[in-house]
Amino acid sequence: MTEVRMTSREARQECRVPFSGFVIHSSFSRRWRSGSALIAVFWMIAVLGMVMFTGAKALQADTDYTRTMRGRIFAKRYAEMGLELARHPAIQHDDPLLHFSSNDDGGYNVTLVSEEARLNINHLLQTGDKVLLRRLFTRWGFKPEFTAALYDALIDWVDADENVSLNGAEKREYEKAGLEGLPFNRPFKEVEEMLYVRGMDIVNTERPDWREWFTVFGSGMVDVNDASAELISLLGDVPMERVQPLLTFRAGRDGTLRTQDDQRLASVPQVAQMLGVFNRQTVEQLTQWIQFAGPIRRIESVGSLGPLQRKLILITQGGQAIWRGELPLHGKDS
């Protein structure tokens, strides 16, 4: 026999691998395994990239949350600073100390107004005054049926009995809605309680600033020297443009409210004349609804840090605090 010798290179070239009925050269098998490994590497890179991206986004979200919470805390601190400063009896509505800005883009702005420059919800309901509330809800765009039902539900909330008004809601109606222990059948102790009344959730959605219109303190007569233009328009039942002469008078010569030259309204005939109201019934209503120097003080302090703001309220009477809380700032980062 003739011995055949092959070099190692020739042997490798002649080595064959059976695969599915085909004979594959070893060089092709090696390239196939290398390609599979490369694909696996690409997959690992993609997975690691996704993990790193997710981690980075989570870290960014955590950082943003921490920054926001820090900003809210400092904004509230500034608001508290303004609130405590404004409590001093010597501070007047035009005092420059009511406004402060710091080097860290923070600060506070404080406003001193009469708490009675709002509608006293308890007084309106207990005296059976349907005119102002229905007029208000109608101006806010609510239909007459909803307005009537909401008014009756408010009446049922503050009266002492369990008799249901025509479109109102007492214990049974609230229980059907899954709400136990309602209504309280007593006057509102604070404005926020109004949110529990059936229908007020809709008002809260459509008019999130509704809290700014009401109070539970005072005699029930609105202080027109601090009342908003919208509220004065409501009281006089006149369009907004008719309120402008009154606003101009209050602002004084410099045209800026809450400065030293501000002027104060003093009588119902003066208010009626500026509003262009000469109807006897309307003048009589104004006599019942308005006053000119409410004794209850409302301190509104807005603290800020960058775009973040917090609004704190302190209500005082005779130098004593009777309510303190925080209200949302609508249309602002808070």
Model segments located where?
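Compositionally biased linear targeting/interaction segments
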Residues: 36-334
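N-terminal leader/signal peptides at the extreme start of proteins
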Residues: 1-34
